[in-house]
Amino acid sequence: MKLLTDFLPIILFFVAYRIHGIYTATEVLIVAAILLMAWQWWRRGRVETMTWVSTLLILTFGGLTLYFHNDTFIKIKPSILYVLFAAALLFTHWREEPLLQRLMGGQLPAALPLSFWRRLNGYWIAFFLFGAVLNLIVAYAFSTGIWVDFKLFGMLAITVIFVLFQAVVISRALPQEAKDGDSSA
């Protein structure tokens, strides 16, 4: 359910683009992002940091797109978001507890070494920087229609493949008892 609600603004953007074009799609994206924030607040009593950052960028770059009637602003928004994510991960990379460890640490055994968390953190930094560059290439080298398709389908596919790769990396790093379901109980 969470995955669907997180992707709903992008899906609505895609549908609105196909029906009415980039400027209506941008308006729909702005409204959908605000509604997602309201829904998170109503449902959980708080808004996730990622939703705050994404909505702020959507309001800023979507607003600039509509004000100047120039779709370049909305096209660079994903790249800026990816660079911000990479920067946040990089900022904590050499600290006692990398950001990724703080975000995922409760879901994995505490026995995983700091070197593992730094490696995983580094993979995500590289992924976000790759996504930022790839988005800019598609935004500037191809039509808006191709960029919209890439934004929904291309980046989604790349993200799924990367997450599967991360699952393999994590599963190989888990202690044997965690893989076996802690059979000592």
From Swiss-Prot:
This is Inner membrane-spanning protein YciB. It comes from the Bacteria. It comes from Acidithiobacillus ferrooxidans (strain ATCC 23270 / DSM 14882 / CIP 104768 / NCIMB 8455) (Ferrobacillus ferrooxidans (strain ATCC 23270)). It holds the Pfam family IspA. The lineage of its organism: Bacteria, Pseudomonadati, Pseudomonadota, Acidithiobacillia, Acidithiobacillales. The chain crosses the membrane at residues 19-39, 49-69, 72-92, 122-142, 150-170. It is found in: Cell inner membrane. Belongs to the YciB family. Plays a role in cell envelope biogenesis, maintenance of cell envelope integrity and membrane homeostasis. Keywords: Cell inner membrane, Cell membrane, Membrane, Transmembrane, Transmembrane helix. It is a multi-pass membrane protein. GO terms for cellular component: plasma membrane. The keyword Membrane applies.
